Amino acid sequence: MEGVAALLRWYVEQGVDETIGEQPIDRFAAPPPSAIAAAAPAASPAALRAPTPLRTTPPPSPSRAPVPIESPQLVEDARALAARCSTLAELETAIRGFEGCALKRTAKNTVFADGKPDAPVMVVGEAPGADEDRLGKPFVGVSGQLMDRMMSAIGLTRDGGFYITNILFWRPPGNRTPTSTEQGMCLAFTQRHIELARPNVLVLAGGVAVKAVLDTTEGITRLRGKWTSYRLGDGTVIPTMPTFHPAYLLRTPASKRQSWQDLLAIDKKLTELG
């Protein structure tokens, strides 16, 4: 019915005011169209001009930044550069000067770490958000504030209780998923970061961090709350606790109870380690 109504509206717009004439017309006896056209006066050039066709295709969308090409060599370059760093200061300088990762080209700031490097606990999150990108520090937005309150509940602060970073040092444009090359490059620096910080306890916040650092396909819901180990290059084993990312807790408040259990386990482990 909508199609019929649209057709009738079109007829009205074209000036049609009747559907059936008062007198019948014998179309077979009418002269052919060619004869009518020949008898009609010549149309002006303006009348012969073809009407502007309606656009039938949508206008082109704005071009997007091309997805970086995967390159295993870039990952190897990052590993080699990270291995040459013997201090955290050298590592930070190397990361800030590294131009191989496409994420850096669209980020406002390099987000390295925050807190005391010699703190007993090192937290590794996922990626900088808009607030972190703007300020150049990890976990400073709403989820970061929740992280601070959580750690404070077991007596840990950034002033000396815990040291915090992410596996990515630059915010992905539009929060897109990083490519395997981008993640591999950043992971090379993160692994060296953990080596140099040598915390007593390592906390991995979020499924992305857990899968990358532990090199596992297991999901965060199956791993959280269970102690595992992270082994350094010299054989040192660091007790490691996978836990939910605070951003997830903001979306799923019911999971805060499980995270509280994780925090209590971390507090107990620190007591055991002295």
Task: Give residue ranges: language-model regions.
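A polyanion-binding, active-site-adjacent surface
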Residues: 10, 17-18, 22-274
